[in-house]
A protein has these predicted regions:
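Intrinsically disordered, low-complexity coil segments
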Residues: 15-24, 123-127, 166-176
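Consensus "Asn ladder" position of solenoid repeat domains
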Residues: 40, 62, 83, 104, ...
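Canonical leucine-rich repeat
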Residues: 45-48, 67, 88, 109, ...
Length: 179
């Protein structure tokens, strides 16, 4: 199973040429604002760049190790939880409001270019040592359990209603500061 097969299934692309050697994006694909390719054993989202109108992407519970969202500037919701991501660049997604990237292998996560972010779930990224949410003033929900954070500053997140940083966060990871 791969992303290309999913896109064919949805009617977002067509294979043309000898043995489907070329692919074209269909009108339905060009207009697509939502893609849910979760739980399909997909290892790569190569081709996601051909969907610039994309607002919602759910690619959770796959085997994705890299994710290039630089050509998806309208992305509002992203769930890439349960993959093999070591890095995630959301700096080109300035209207992103919900980011779920739990259960990956992230070592860093920068959200300073996502001022509209209201939901951030980044739990179970055991190598994640730093998280700066001071540039996310609209953040209402932050779940960052089971990481390696040593400090967390939420003093700028005045809208915060839900903060989950438990499950050994303080004891196991020696949390030094929580503002």
């Amino acid at each position: 199973p791969n992303f290309r097969a999913y896109l064919l299934e949805q009617g977002y692309i067509e294979e043309i040429g000898e043995n489907g050697s070329r692919v074209v994006v269909t009108p339905a694909g060009r207009a697509a604002t939502k893609i849910d390719c979760s739980r399909r054993g997909i290892a790569s989202l190569a081709g996601i760049e051909y969907f610039p109108l994309l607002e919602e992407l759910n690619c959770c519970m796959n085997m994705i190790s890299t994710l290039d969202l630089t050509q998806n500037p309208r992305l509002v919701k992203l769930d890439c939880s349960g993959n093999c991501l070591k890095s995630l660049d959301v700096s080109h997604n300035s209207v992103l409001m919900e980011l779920r990237c739990m259960l990956n292998e992230l070592v860093a996560l920068e959200t300073d270019r996502n001022p509209k972010l209201t939901v951030l779930h980044c739990a179970f990224n055991r190598s994640l040592k730093a998280l700066d949410v001071t540039g996310n003033p609209l953040l209402k929900e932050l779940v960052c359990t089971e990481n390696s954070l040593s400090s967390l500053d939420v003093s700028h997140n005045l809208e915060l209603k839900k903060l989950m940083c438990g499950n050994g966060f303080v004891k196991k990871n020696r949390l030094e500061t929580l503002d």
